[in-house]
Structures are given as structure tokens and as C-alpha cells.
From Swiss-Prot:
InterPro entries in UniProt: MeTrfase_TrmA_AS, MeTrfase_TrmA_CS, NA-bd_OB-fold, SAM-dependent_MTases_sf, TRAM_dom, U5_MeTrfase_fam
PANTHER family linked: RNA M5U METHYLTRANSFERASE, TRNA (URACIL(54)-C(5))-METHYLTRANSFERASE
Enzyme class, broadest EC rank: transferase
Protein name: Uncharacterized RNA methyltransferase GSU1452
Binding site residues for S-adenosyl-L-methionine: 299, 328, 349, 397
Higher taxonomy: Bacteria, Pseudomonadati, Thermodesulfobacteriota, Desulfuromonadia, Geobacterales
Organism: Geobacter sulfurreducens (strain ATCC 51573 / DSM 12127 / PCA)
Family from the record: Belongs to the class I-like SAM-binding methyltransferase superfamily. RNA M5U methyltransferase family.
């Protein structure tokens, strides 16, 4: 992006703006995707590559009735938050980390501001304290896994991600967010594709073999797993590629061929073939060991995950006498972290494979007071209550869409003294906290955690306590929750 102003540029004006036009505007905020927000002729414009307190020249990429979208081509007046030299030479062209051009303290401030803006939309949450964002232990090289597209030809292979608004694959080379071992694996695989003449899959023609590369690493052991996703078995080509990879990077201890012949953008298929004797990695967080298989879910930022788990344990205030339910428990991370200070922990998860991993992790750590069950969260928590189980603490860790109202009603009906809610989406977190307020639970504080530096994503932990009982407290249906306050047209908040 050029920072010099060109006096010869003709700028668009008036309501007849069209795609490709150049406009000048002042940027006042960031949206939830990390794009700048400004106005042009009274219409909101979302500008890729722009920061608050900047004036930019931008090219319109989409013209809608209510919003315009643009890409900054020139920063006329830079923000104090803008870095003079970003950590990645692809900044501005890669969608992976739009905030890499911003000073890290400003990223943390924006994430708190964005979280607080979502929380304050609800009158019931006015007393909740939104704390300063906890930083990631590592701002770069924190990702312990990568899912990458393989493109090009065996003579000139490309491994990376799709360019913005395109099916063209951008070679990521050495990514500053990836653990250095991941970057070494990617480099070795590119060399191996050429050396072993591995045919690269072409989605237009349906020809070729290798579609994706998935890399996972264990920070504890310094070892790696490589998963080659192919359209068919073809053992010969992948066997030679695996041999080259392990010779080039001896830290690769697990190599898997996954066969995915389906169309579409789903990465992993249903069939795995292990090309090594070892089938999994082992990671450790806070003294708890986890088995990482090709399909296991594991947080991509190990240091950030440790902060979340430790905060949940601290806010739970367990004494060893409590019964805990961990809803949406995944592979059992939080449940196993809490087991040492609880009487018993029940993990509930809808994905059966994740429950199998959780049970395996409990055995690995010789933890005997954790049980895990696969099924519907609302139904299983109701069964626990009907069986006479007293629930002292409920931990919620749902996907981005948040919790169903039925789940929240069942949780409130169980009457735990405390609820700790872990969320990856501030908007749905605020919505669910408002529902729980109507069901008798007050949100005391919300803790943003930066799990994904250089990106707009933010995790949050909320602590809720049961209010003093009122006759009508738990009779309020979820649908009667307070309506959010009128929100600004532009999403997000200023840095």
C-alpha cells in the first residue's frame, strides 16, 4: 500500500459510486473482522487495511444499498497505532492476520473495547466489569497447527491459503504466526513434492493427487505431525514424500495419509492411513497431558489456552467438595484442569469422537473423578438433576453460535451457585449472559483473552453468580430477555 498521495487520481463523488471507484474517507472504528469503518456520502464503508484515526484512499470492491466495501490503496494520514514495519511482508494481501499492521497494545485495547460494546448493548449487564485484555504469551509463532491448500504443479508447488475473494492460492512461505517447526515442515514438503514428482490436485479438472497439508506440533516434545490429504490412496507417491519429509525434518514423528475424494471445501475425509508407527502427539498444559490425533480438536495457541484454563480454575473457587458440569467439554481440557480441586466433574459433548479423546486423556493423566458422555447438552444436564445430582458449578464453552435457550434454561433450573462461561464470540456471549440474567444469574465480570494475536478474534471468560432468590426469578422465560440497546450502524468500536 502506497503512503504517498497521488494528485492525479480522480475520486468518485455522489450516490452513484460504483465498484472500482476511488474514494477518500476518514476511518473512525474497526468492525468485527478487523476492517476499518468510515462513511462516504452518508453510507458506511468497511475498508480492508485501514485503522481508526486514519484518512485513506480506497478502491470500492462492493456497492450495496446499505454498505460499501473497499480496500485501502493509500494511507494519507496514518494512525499512531500503525506499525511502520509490520512483521509480515504479505500484510495487506493476506486475510489471515489483518491486525498485524497495528501495535500490539492497541490490539489489546480494541479487543476490550469491542467486547465491552457488545456487553453494554444489554441493560441487564450494565454492572458487569469488563477487564483489560490478557495478552498472549507469544504474539508471533503461536499457532501450533496449520491447514493449508496445495496448488500449482509438482515442478512449481504452492502451499498456502486462498487470496482474498479468489480461488487463487497464495504461497505463505514462512508465516510469522506459525510455530517455526510448521514453517520447516511446509518448506520440506514443497521440496519433496518437486523431488518425488507428486501430482498436485487441480480442482478445475479433477486431476492430480495431493489436495491439502495439515501440520500439528507439540510444543512440549518439539515434535510434529503431517497429514497429507489426497483424492485417492496412491501409496507410492505419498510414501516417497513422507520419507523425504522425515529425512529433512526428523522432528516429524507422525505422518498420515487422509483420503478425501469428495467435492467442496471440507478438508479431511473419512479414511486415515498411518505411514509411521506413532499415531499421535502428546501435549501438556499446566501439568495435564493431552493426546493429539489427526482429528482431535486442540486450541491452536497453547499458551493462550493455559491462561484460559487457569482463569476458569481460579474463578471457579473450588474447595474439593463440589460437583461440576463442563458443557461442550470437547477433549476434556477444562474438565481435567478442574478435576484436582473438585469432588467430581461431568463432561458433556455432542461429538462422540471428542468424548473418546476426553476419556483417553483422563486415563493418560490417571484422573478418576471425571466422567464424559456424548449427547444433547440440555437432555443430559436434565438427567443429572433428575438423578439427584447437585450441581455446584457449570462451565459453558459453546461454539461461536452460543448456547441454545433451552440449554440455558436447564442450566438455570439446576441452580448452580456459579457459572463460568468461555466464549469465542462476544456478540453471542452478551446475548446469552442477558438470557441468564433473566433466569436469576448476575454477571460479575468478563475477562477478554487474546488467543489470536494479529487477528480480530477474541476469547472471553465470564463469571456469573446466582442472585438472591425472588418468587419470579426462575420463572422468566428466555424469550422475555431484555432487548439490546440500539446499536450503531457500524459494527465494532474505535481503538
Amino acid at each position: 500500500m502506497n503512503k504517498k498521495r497521488s494528485p492525479k487520481t480522480v475520486l468518485a463523488a455522489g450516490p452513484s459510486s460504483k465498484r472500482g471507484d476511488l474514494i477518500e474517507l476518514a476511518v473512525t472504528a474497526l468492525d468485527e473482522d478487523g476492517n476499518g469503518i468510515g462513511t462516504h456520502d452518508g453510507t458506511n464503508v468497511h475498508v480492508i487495511g485501514a485503522l481508526p484515526d486514519e484518512r485513506v484512499r480506497a478502491r470500492l470492491t462492493h456497492v450495496g444499498k446499505r454498505h460499501l466495501h473497499a480496500e485501502a490503496v493509500e494511507v494519507l494520514t496514518p494512525s499512531r497505532a500503525r506499525l511502520a514495519q509490520p512483521s509480515c511482508k504479505r500484510a495487506g494481501s493476506c486475510d489471515g492476520c489483518p491486525l498485524i499492521v497495528m501495535h500490539y497494545p492497541d490490539q489489546l485495547n480494541w479487543k476490550r473495547t469491542f467486547t465491552e460494546r457488545q456487553i453494554r448493548r444489554y441493560q441487564t449487564l450494565g454492572a458487569a466489569e469488563v477487564l483489560a485484555t490478557l495478552p498472549s504469551p507469544n504474539q508471533l509463532h503461536y499457532r501450533n497447527s496449520a491447514k493449508l491448500v496445495v496448488s500449482g504443479t509438482f515442478r512449481r508447488p504452492v502451499i498456502g491459503i486462498y487470496r482474498r475473494n479468489s480461488h487463487q492460492v497464495m504461497d505463505i512461505g514462512t508465516c510469522p504466526l506459525h510455530h517455526p517447526l510448521i514453517n520447516r515442515v511446509v518448506t520440506a514438503v514443497k521440496e519433496g513434492i518437486a523431488k518425488c514428482k507428486v501430482q498436485v490436485y487441480n480442482p478445475r479438472t479433477g486431476s492430480g493427487l495431493l489436495r491439502y497439508l495439515v501440520v500439528r506440533i507439540s510444543e512440549r516434545t518439539g515434535t510434529a505431525m503431517a497429514v497429507f490429504v489426497t483424492v485417492e490412496r496412491n501409496y507410492n507417491e505419498i510414501h516417497h514424500l513422507a520419507k523425504h519429509l522425515q529425512q529433512s525434518v526428523p522432528q516429524v514423528e507422525v505422518v498420515v495419509q487422509n483420503v478425501n475424494s469428495s467435492e467442496g471445501n471440507v478438508i479431511l475425509g473419512q479414511r486415515d492411513y498411518f505411514l509411521t508407527r506413532q499415531h499421535a502427539l502428546t501435549e501438556e498444559l499446566g501439568g495435564i497431558r493431552f493426546t493429539i490425533s489427526p482429528r482431535s480438536f486442540f486450541q491452536v495457541n497453547s499458551g493462550g489456552a493455559r491462561i484460559i484454563y487457569e482463569t476458569v480454575r481460579q474463578w471457579s473457587s473450588l474447595t474439593g467438595k463440589e460437583s461440576v458440569v463442563d458443557l461442550y467439554c470437547g477433549i476434556g481440557g477444562i474438565a481435567l484442569f478442574l478435576a484436582g480441586t473438585a469432588r467430581e466433574v461431568h463432561g458433556i459433548e455432542v461429538v462422540e469422537a471428542a468424548v473418546n479423546d476426553a476419556e483417553s486423556n483422563a486415563r493418560l493423566n490417571r484422573i478418576h473423578n471425571c466422567s464424559f458422555e456424548a449427547g444433547d447438552a440440555a437432555e443430559l444436564i436434565e438427567e443429572l438433576v433428575e438423578e439427584g445430582e447437585r450441581l455446584d458449578l457449570v462451565v459453558l464453552n459453546p461454539p461461536r453460535k452460543g448456547c441454545d435457550a433451552g440449554v440455558l434454561n436447564k442450566v438455570a433450573a439446576a441452580g448452580p451457585a456459579r457459572i463460568v462461561y468461555v466464549s469465542c464470540a462476544p456478540a453471542t456471549l452478551a446475548r446469552d449472559l442477558d438470557i441468564l440474567a433473566g433466569l436469576g444469574y448476575a454477571t460479575l465480570r468478563v475477562q477478554p483473552v487474546d488467543m489470536f494475536p494479529q487477528t480480530p478474534h477474541v476469547e472471553n471468560i465470564a463469571l456469573l453468580v446466582k442472585k438472591l432468590p425472588r418468587n419470579d426469578r426462575l420463572e422468566s422465560p428466555a424469550k422475555e430477555r431484555s432487548r439490546p440497546r440500539a446499536s450503531h450502524k457500524a459494527k465494532g468500536g474505535a481503538v
